[in-house]
Amino acid sequence: MQNCRRCISLTGLLRMTLYLRPSFSIDLSLRRLHRAAFLFSRKKPETNLSTLFKPVQVHAYVDSEDVGSELSGKLEKAELLKILNKFTQRREIKSLCNENGLDDYLQQQAFGSFRRFCIEAENLPVDLHITFSDITQGAGHIDDIFPYFLRHAKTVFPHLDCMDDLKKISDLRQPANWYSNARAITRKIVFHAGPTNSGKTYHAMERYLSAKTGVYCGPLKLLATEVYNKANERGTPCDLVTGEERKFGISESLPANHVACTVEMTSVNTPYEVAVIDEIQQIRDPQRGWAWTRAFLGLIADEVHVCGEPGALDLLQKICETTGETVEVRLYDRLTELTVENTALGSLDNIVPGDCIVCFSKHDIYTVSREIEARGKEVAVIYGGLPPGTKLAQAAKFNDPANSCKVMVATDAIGMGLNLSIRRIIFYSLIKPSMNERGEREIDTISVSSALQIAGRAGRFRTQWEHGYVTAFKSEDLQTLQRILARTPEPIKQAGLHPTADQIELYAYHLPSSSLSNLMDIFVNLCTVDDSLYFMCNIEDFKFLAEMIQHVALPLRARYVFCCAPINRKMPFVCSMFLKVARQYSRNEPITFDFIKKNCGWPFKLPKTILDLVHLEAVFDVMDLYLWLSYRFMDLFPEAAYVRDAQKELDEIIQQGVFQITRLLKNTEASQDGETSNYAIRRITHVKEPRLPSLSRGRLTERLLAQGLLTPGMLSELRKEWDAQQLGKSNSQSNENSEPVVNSDDEDNYSGIGRKTRKKRRK
């Protein structure tokens, strides 16, 4: 328990794992428990750098004339083997290997390769043959083999000859020096610091719009699009640049002086008068933080206006010390009042107009939405997987005073990018899955920064709900929420970095036999970073895509670009389409709209179930992928206009599906009666806590231990928690002989477990 950052007991995790719907198999429970146990027991092993270097196969030496034998006679294979075995066991040889960069792992690999090279070859190089002959005749020493062995080892492991070059390429200690054009001018850095709804971005944008030239760098397409629209409405021609889209304030042939873009698309080669970097606290993001670091260090602008949390100030000042710049700080207070309520919501019966329930999982979104609509209230739904148009439509529906929809259910996707008129934020849970900088999945209490960002959405300036309120759904979460919101966000300590395509190309030049995934691993493990200011961003998504298309013949630069594509690797359909597109590209065949239609099931139909809706969302992401690639490989993705039109049509269909999400939920459950579905598998029914089956004996415990999903220590801890719970309940339950309280549709599944458990305990 000591090595766990979670606020969930082991018993609680087992409840989440084991008490599922009746149709769930025990294998599913094992998989879920595997993930739960992983959170408690996983410690990332230290990587031995040498194991990342894959040996290069050395072809056998061919000499049809066998000059070595003519000069010094034939060599017996058995005698050669004795010499080689003695050679590999000598301490002096191992010491020489260490001096030449061959650690124990590399020695073992190189010795094995050298032995096979000598034994399996029909004949040897002349100089090596003569050396072996001298040793067998007593005219030479066994150590004389070392120069030939070292030559072979450097052929097997080419990095031995270029280790200094590799280290120099991956020296990331001074990223500010990568941007010589930005360092050549004196930039004015202005930090607009304040909480949500404080007007900090407004003041930065006013300066942006008044400048002769400017660029806005935002975290989301929605924010960039909003700036694009506002600038053009106010008479300032502005272009839009995102990964998947280009729009022009004047015309395609005449670029506007102002640009609104997503932060990854920021140009560090174009000079501007004013640059605005929004949500600078994202510089610490484990996946995308590098983009904010690049923009902050690389923008060529007379004025760089940075907006975000005050917690980023110390880090920005330290980074500016390395560039010789200073930071002008402008602090802002919240424009409207925000009150944390003293009572939890407790029940969905207490929902009132203007409420927004924030959930951290799709299945909670579905469950809460249906429960609210069952009470006769219309619901707007927003989560990260929805297309931007659908999000805007749902936001407009909720914001419209004339619309009957007065309640919203959303994920933390509402934290930025949408203007919402919310009276009260209700946290359905405080437990949120996240990914740390090492690429490990964590379940933890929501961070102070995230909680304040979401809570701050309540009570917006100049809307019908200027006074905002915040509370929790569960009474047991309320005190924790109050403590979180009373705290100041922790100062941001590090900014993200990421290998560039140029750096990886240089690595590939020195290590031509290594795969892209392998090159990334070597780079990350070999790089030097000033960890007082920076960290290396997580590359697991990049590696996942690199390994997926490793067998596809692509040039390195194209392979790198493909692996940078914004893909959710948890969506199998999107991943399979990514692979198909890569194969088509590798054959130099255009990826046409017909290709997309054929593989995505066009024309699209209205979704009838949640599974249909999820699939349409995946198809939308595939079209996003096409558009993203079309701006990078225009010749082989020639029909972006057709795909964009189809995507707009699909967006409208998804909107209609989300508008009737409750009916989709009903259809899903009706169609899955008596069978297991992907949706049902993911859904955990919220029930009062039934008794746990005995963990001290039985087939399940044995299987968990045998598969390594539970350790004896974890099992002991579980027993202690179980006994403590039963002891606390014994007084109140001593005269009761009732079944556990469950939902009616789960009763058959749980009652048998409960009876068996009580029989065992009575025995």
UniProtKB/Swiss-Prot annotation:
Its cofactor is Mg(2+); Mn(2+). The keyword Transit peptide applies. GO terms for biological process: mitochondrial mRNA catabolic process; mitochondrial mRNA polyadenylation; mitochondrial RNA 3'-end processing; mitochondrial RNA processing; mitochondrial tRNA processing; positive regulation of mitochondrial translation; regulation of mitochondrial mRNA stability. Residues 724-763 are annotated as: Disordered. SUPFAM superfamilies: P-loop containing nucleoside triphosphate hydrolases. Its EC number is 3.6.4.13. Keywords: ATP-binding, Helicase, Hydrolase, Mitochondrion, Nucleotide-binding, Transit peptide. It catalyses: ATP + H2O = ADP + phosphate + H(+). PANTHER family: ATP-DEPENDENT RNA AND DNA HELICASE (PTHR12131), ATP-DEPENDENT RNA HELICASE SUPV3L1, MITOCHONDRIAL-RELATED (PTHR12131:SF1). Major helicase player in mitochondrial RNA metabolism and maintenance. Likely component of the mitochondrial degradosome (mtEXO) complex, that degrades 3' overhang double-stranded RNA with a 3'-to-5' directionality in an ATP-dependent manner. ATPase and ATP-dependent multisubstrate helicase, able to unwind double-stranded (ds) DNA and RNA, and RNA/DNA heteroduplexes in the 5'-to-3' direction. Regulates mRNA stability and is required for the correct processing and maturation of mitochondrial transcripts. This is ATP-dependent RNA helicase SUV3 homolog, mitochondrial. It comes from Drosophila melanogaster (Fruit fly).
